[in-house]
């Protein structure tokens, strides 16, 4: 099977080339705004008709080369389609930050031997150096580069390249370890594996820092000035970057601390936002804005690269079912003191650990080729095995 990841490559430029790249990126962004205005007026998302009506104007007004003009039109159309899919209404996107979309072997190329990045600009092709550290593995014969984005941040240039490569699938006969992962707020992740080991990833620091960012935004919202709104946007972006780094560290630790042939079993939290009415008003923002999906995505692609697999199962009753005797009752769990105590057999443990144990048990019952069909099996339907203490 194929996997695509986005690799980040730093471009090293001298002052003269820096100005050329800045001018090209600015012209490209201005052209995107021009096309965005045309589409907003016409509501036309046909690439053929948009290209027919704007291609020559883009080249004449902004000086873009042929492939750049076509890439500009594709970028704007894709942006509109994303907005319509998510917002269900016409909102005009504005391209404020300078950017440049580059097609592999047409607009840009990379020379791994000499560490040279060749790119088309308004002034023709230029060649600059790039930092190859951490990128060497992508220069193998099996890797294919896609349309990259050149961006500038804090005076530095970075190339974001989608890289597609082949990976071997993990057959169910090679699964030797099952890890149940319970995600939450008090603990970002709690795991339970086939050797009976439990690991807790504490979330208190993350919770406190997010509360700090929320208080800052609330204070700035009361000011209501343009500068305060810019500050709010910057704080939100900083928080997102920091949270993504936390998810990266956790997913990396999970993958590297488990051997090849590991099956990670997670709860399917697709409808977590729909459950807000069961959460106290003051806790709703924290609950619905938690980055469960980001951690899931990072773990999924990292696991595939290490000959591991991640699947999702129905989370119903995972926190109410005793992993020792199978008794399911809401009263088994005491949320206030974060403790699970079975009303039938008396088995007691941390409630998040119980969730991880039940997910581990459900993972052992899954057949990987039938994982999609078995995703909605519940904890109460799985045969109970006595866990290691």
Model-assigned labels for residue ranges:
Residues 1-389:
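Nucleic-acid substrate recognition interfaces
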């Amino acid at each position: 099977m194929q996997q695509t990841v986005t690799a980040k490559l730093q471009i090293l430029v001298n002052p003269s080339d820096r100005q050329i790249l800045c001018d090209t990126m600015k012209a490209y962004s201005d052209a995107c705004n021009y096309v965005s205005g045309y589409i907003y007026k016409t509501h036309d998302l046909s690439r053929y008709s948009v290209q027919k009506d704007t291609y020559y104007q883009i080249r004449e007004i902004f000086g873009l080369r042929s492939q750049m003009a076509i890439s500009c039109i594709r970028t704007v159309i894709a942006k509109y389609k994303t907005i319509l899919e998510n917002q269900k209404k016409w909102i005009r996107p504005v391209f404020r930050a300078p950017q440049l979309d580059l097609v592999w072997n047409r607009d840009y190329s990379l020379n791994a031997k000499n560490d040279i990045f060749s790119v088309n600009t308004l002034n023709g092709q230029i060649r600059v150096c790039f930092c190859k550290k951490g990128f060497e593995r992508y220069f193998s014969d099996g890797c294919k580069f896609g349309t990259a984005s050149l961006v500038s941040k804090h005076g530095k240039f970075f190339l974001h390249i989608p890289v597609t490569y082949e990976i071997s699938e993990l057959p169910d006969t090679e699964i030797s370890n099952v890890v149940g992962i319970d995600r939450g707020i008090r603990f970002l992740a709690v795991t339970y594996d086939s050797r009976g080991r439990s690991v807790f990833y504490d979330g208190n620091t993350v919770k406190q820092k997010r509360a700090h960012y929320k208080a800052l935004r609330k204070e700035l919202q009361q000011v209501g000035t343009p500068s305060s709104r810019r500050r709010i946007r910057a704080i939100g972006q900083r928080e997102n970057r920091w949270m993504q780094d936390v998810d990266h560290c956790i997913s990396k630790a999970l993958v590297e601390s488990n051997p090849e042939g590991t099956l990670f079993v997670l709860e399917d939290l697709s409808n977590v936002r729909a459950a807000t009415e069961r959460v106290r008003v003051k806790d709703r923002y924290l609950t619905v804005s938690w980055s469960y999906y980001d951690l899931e995505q990072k773990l999924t692609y990292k696991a595939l690269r290490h000959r591991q697999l991640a699947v999702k199962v129905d989370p119903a009753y995972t926190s109410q079912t005793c992993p020792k005797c199978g008794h399911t009752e809401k009263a088994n769990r005491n949320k206030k003191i974060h403790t699970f105590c079975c009303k039938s057999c008396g088995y007691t443990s941390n409630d998040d650990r119980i969730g991880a144990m039940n997910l581990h048990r459900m993972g052992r019952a899954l057949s990987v080729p039938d994982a999609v069909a078995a995703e909605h099996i519940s904890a109460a339907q799985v045969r109970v095995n006595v866990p290691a203490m």
